[in-house]
Amino acid sequence: MTRTAVLLLTLLFLVAMAASDKIKTREVCWNEEECENWE
């Protein structure tokens, strides 16, 4: 594996983690104003 491939995989992983976190927060709060309190 090249370093570029490893970097891309790491970035994809981080983006996926961030996306799943946002989805979890969306389940908890219903509007943007309440979401800010969950960060």
Curated annotation (Swiss-Prot):
One of its GO terms (cellular component) is extracellular region. Keywords: Disulfide bond, Neurotoxin, Secreted, Signal, Toxin. It is found in: Secreted. Expressed by the venom duct. The keyword Iron-sulfur does not apply. Its main location: secreted. It comes from the Eukaryota. Residues 1-20 form the signal peptide. One of its GO terms (molecular function) is toxin activity. Disulfide bonds join 29-35. Probable neurotoxin. The cysteine framework is C-C. This is Contryphan-Cal4.
